[in-house]
Amino acid sequence: MAEIRLQHLAHSYSKTPSGPEDYAIREMDHIWEQGGAYALLGPSGCGKSTLLNIISGLLSPSQGHVLFDGKAVNDLTPEKRNIAQVFQFPVVYDTMTVFDNLAFPLRNQGLAEAKVHSKVQEIAEVLDLQNLLSKKARNLTADEKQKVSMGRGLVRDDVSAILFDEPLTVIDPYLKWKLRRKLKQIHEQFNITMVYVTHDQLEASTFADKIAVMYGGQIVQFGTPRELFERPSHTFVGYFIGSPGMNLIEVQPQPGGVGFNSTHLPLSDGLQRHIEHGQWKNLKVGIRPEFIHVWDEPFDDAMQARVVHVEDLGTYKIMTLDLDGAPLKVRLAEDKPVPQGTAYISFPAQWLMVYADEFLLDATDSEVQP
């Protein structure tokens, strides 16, 4: 098990990068603590697999350092880093039995056959592979092959971390759920550092204790699933996490707050000072569809919005509204009345986020939160 630390790490596939747009990984510092279950979440092309390959040693970074337990490993080959990597498509030795696949890394280390047999049996039991040990790998299903790939990483006692690169992409949805649960059980049992790469927020939130969200070659937020949902540090996190994603409205500074068209949104004194003293290129407000209050008749200072569309999804409804020219999504509980034609809404102050140049403004801090 290892703490994985990235120091001033950056990577470009270009030999002569001329700007940030030429970098697959923009300069970053990050720590994955020993024994944690982490997810690296983001859309295709954001740099997830590149970062994973740098950690495992399959790729050398253009700059910066990778440290395991405080020791730089940039010059170490993948096998000397003691990293196990499970890829999107299962990698097994088709002509070998499941037993021999699992035993392969142990025999390469020269372990006694009695120890090999004991360890293979232990891992086979954990992964429910006992009845398949004598079966040739070529005859396995996709999920069985992926479990064998995972088992080869778990079978070694000296593995520093296991890296999963979208390992469930080719697995049926029901089996995905079973394997995610199995991975969680394995982590709790072995307490090994695991980093799970995915573009699926459900996979990330059900596996990981903490999620690193990547966008444009950067980790734009690192936190628990709840933190990412309730307080996104970047507009991309707000949009990407949740279904539907966060509502984002471009606004302009106004006395006492911000506004758009004829709508005014009051803000705290701290946020107002931030906005007044900053040189921002753009300002946005964001609020989750779940956090918008809705009434079907005028209520206090509620804003009036036009109901454009209502989608009934069984256990909840999604309303599309037009608020002074800005489209909004609102999530309504199944038992809540649906306004007809006109809705009256409010944005609770604790759930209304303000973003300057796409990053969250925090009234308690003196600068934008990166």
Regions found by a protein language model. Give the residues of each.
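Short beta-strand immediately N-terminal to the Walker A/P-loop
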Residues: Y38-A39, Q85
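Non-catalytic connector elements of ABC transporters
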Residues: P255-P370
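A short, flexible loop at the N-terminus of ABC-type nucleotide-binding domains that lies
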Residues: M1-L6, S12-E27, I31-Q34, D75-T77
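ABC ATPase nucleotide-binding domains
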Residues: N82, Q88, V92-F236
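Helix-to-loop junction immediately C-terminal to a conserved catalytic motif
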Residues: S56
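The feature captures the beta-strand-to-loop junction immediately N-terminal to the Walker
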Residues: L41-P43
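Conserved ABC transporter NBD signature motif
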Residues: G64-A72
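ABC ATPase nucleotide-binding domain helices that frame the ATP-binding cleft
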Residues: S49-L52, V148-M150
